[in-house]
Amino acid sequence: MIRFLSVSLFSITFILSKEVSIKSIELSGPITDRKQEISGMDWYNDNLFFLPENQGGFLFMITKSEIQNNLQKDDQKPIVARQTKFSTPDYSKLIPGFDGFEAICFSNENVYISIESEHNDIMSGHIAWGTIDKKTFEITIPPKNIKKVKTPTQISNMSFESILMHDDHALMLYEANGANLQRGAYHILFSPKDQNTSRIRSVNIEYRITDATRVDENGKFWTINYFWPGDKKALEPSRDLIFENTPKGDSHQSSNIVERLIEFEIKNKRIIFTKSEPIQLVLNEDSPRNWESIVRFDNKGFLIATDKHPRMILSFVPFN
């Protein structure tokens, strides 16, 4: 009996500690230039849009069918990402300390963008909103469609890295929510109807939340939870309760880097963890990957993308 119990516990630990290998999707064209610094992506119908951090007057787009064909073929040809027009005000003149775009979200033909700024050592978030043309895919954001949003705490170069829709509100997720940074963590809900903001309480989670999927019909969504050891001083990590409950995978056991996906749900007007196990990615120890974007890929898994560290990477993460 004791021997059986030991074997069972070992098997459970092994299952919970399993890491997922990702599959790269090769792209070509200007999107691969590290200077673009892809910071967000979202689906509009069957088109995947990529948001560069730097203001250049365009986004990038590839289609779902192109991704499917790439993943199904052994002889993969790089997907050429097309540029689509992104008409906005010159935010470098409109927003003091404008630092770039952080996230994008579509809701029918409505588009929401998260913007980061740092002025006089004060971090601020902004939300801007506009529309997309169904035929040309041009996105237009009028100068008046912008609202400044106060961050929950002050950490240099950190603001709202994710936008997702929930009950006709744009939910802006702040990226640093550790127990040593916020006693009562919260995120921001923006109402497009009256442009008012409100708070939604949340559990604490260590490290950074760098992007999130859309909310599903059950109020659940997945996020990228990333830690680069160079951020230790800024993030002041507390106990990692997730790794205390779910053992580290092989590559995570020998590294201080964390690359994983965590599922949350919105329940009783609060953001909490679900019972889903974290998805740990097999690490590339030589090159930590700053995953900045995530979307669901049907019921098959996720697509995730880096900004420029170590380079622009688009990858598929299978569910199993």
Predicted ranges, named:
Residues 2-8:
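Sec-dependent signal peptide recognition
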Residues 8-17:
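Hydrophobic h-region of N-terminal signal peptides that target proteins for export
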Residues 16-320:
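Sequence/structural signature of beta-propeller domains
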